[in-house]
Amino acid sequence: MAVTSPWFRAVVSAAQMQEIENWLFTQGMPVAALMEKAALQTAQRLLTLYPLSTYPRIGVVVGPGHNGGDGLVVARELKLQGYQVQVLQPLDKLKPLTQNHVDYGKSLGIPWVDGVQALAHCDLIIDALFGVGLTRLITGAIADLITTINNLPIPVVSIDLPSGIETDTGEILGVAVEADRSFCLGLWKRAYFQDRALAHLGQTELLGIGLPPQAIANVLGEVWPVQVLGADQAQQTLPLSRPLVTHKYQQGHLLLICGSQQYAGGALLTTLGARASGVGMVTVAVPMGIKALLHSQCPEVLVKGLLETPSGAIAGLGNLDLSRYSAVALGPGLGSDVGPLVEEVLSVNCPLILDADGLNQLAQQQLLPLLAVRTAPTVLTPHGGEFKRLFPDIDQGDRLTAVQTAAAMCQATVLLKGAKTVIASPTGPTWAIKDSTPALARGGSGDVLTGLMGGILAQPEKFDLAQRVATAAWWHAQAGILASQQRTILGVDAQHLAEYLIPACRQWLGPNVANWPANLSHSS
């Protein structure tokens, strides 16, 4: 079976991971061999990150299953490298393979300790209690053990997943280890993209364990159902190369409908995001009262002044010809007193992005069913509160399932904003944005994203719409990360975020930036 995506992009459930492993075992791979591969990769990474000179004393907390077995192999390897290792095994009943590693570890002289306080003098604690697949609540002595570990002033590394986190939903099963670092083994697990798990994961890293591509494809198919978007995909998705002979109208024409007297900045920030996308033309439709502001701040865009309500919001689109544009984005800064704009734009025969007050109007006027009959694609970009108003019956606890359910329900591409933004469409894979920054938790950040996304969707298509939406979210996050590195988390206001979009692009393109066509023949 052909494989179209590198293994490190796949995101799997506990059941899918178990099925992949079972396929390996039916093909003849010993369970012990897979455990050795996973644990040796973990041990090697620990040797790099936690050198003997700084972290000589290691405590390993092991559970009854194969996660505990992984921990015991790690304990063995660290012992052989000169670390002072001790093991805490709070449960007596073990799987046979795990028991084998207990016996071997004791034969090497690794000490077993009886209580968590015996680990208080350690320099590092390794959590190998439960890992992937746990579904029951943690109570009693084990809950007390985890609470004590969390209260110790010692760094904790979890193997595969912090103990106490449900693998698929990220739910905290009563109590969970608060790791400083988590090594995800083999393939990303869904919990790594659930906001409610993030406080327990710490820094995250995927460790390859040599899973054959055919094993993954046998379970997930040729295209992974849930994928992490990476820099290489973003680069391929963006229209970075252009024909030698081109002009602005061939590079897309984006219409932004946004802004009000109260939220004039929303229109400006959306425009700044669009400007960075490379789209050929941008038209901004705003209330007449803020038209001059847009002209003065963004002289290269076309500004349409629209009739406004007494409070300074857009009253209606008037004679605006929606057929002229290759994408339309509506919502940022419109305010609550805006006219019935959403119903007016639903007829556009091009990608339509609804954000902010556009989403609120969609919910208030119960227009969601109309999206299913649109002939052109629709993109909804809610944060958690807007999502609840649009889809009150969908539980957001499991964000991946929630966004997939919403996309299927309304037949639109849905981007659910959060610390881990996720994107789903009615067909095709669900995308997850792995890296972001809390610096983006600022007013106007979403406006910049809407403009950037609109500019990308307005340009000639290279990949499916959901992947282009995900690329906009990924680029937006990378700009936030770069800006926070240079300005600190406190210094990333939305205007500066927009200014970092192109520097972020140059950074992840690296040497390839020199390969962009530098001498394009064009007409303005």
Curated annotation (Swiss-Prot):
Keywords: ATP-binding, Isomerase, Lyase, Metal-binding, Multifunctional enzyme, NAD, NADP, Nucleotide-binding, Potassium. This is Bifunctional NAD(P)H-hydrate repair enzyme Nnr. Its cofactor is K(+). (6S)-NADPHX 1 binds at residue 160. Bifunctional enzyme that catalyzes the epimerization of the S- and R-forms of NAD(P)HX and the dehydration of the S-form of NAD(P)HX at the expense of ADP, which is converted to AMP. This allows the repair of both epimers of NAD(P)HX, a damaged form of NAD(P)H that is a result of enzymatic or heat-dependent hydration. (6S)-NADPHX 2 binds at residues 333, 447. Residues 231-508 form the YjeF C-terminal domain. Residues 17-217 form the YjeF N-terminal domain. It catalyses: (6S)-NADHX + ADP = AMP + phosphate + NADH + H(+); (6S)-NADPHX + ADP = AMP + phosphate + NADPH + H(+); (6R)-NADHX = (6S)-NADHX; (6R)-NADPHX = (6S)-NADPHX. Residues 383-389 are annotated as: NADPHX 2. Its EC number is 4.2.1.136, 5.1.99.6. Residues 231-524 are annotated as: ADP-dependent (S)-NAD(P)H-hydrate dehydratase. Residues 1-223 are annotated as: NAD(P)H-hydrate epimerase. Binds 1 potassium ion per subunit. In the N-terminal section; belongs to the NnrE/AIBP family. In the C-terminal section; belongs to the NnrD/CARKD family.
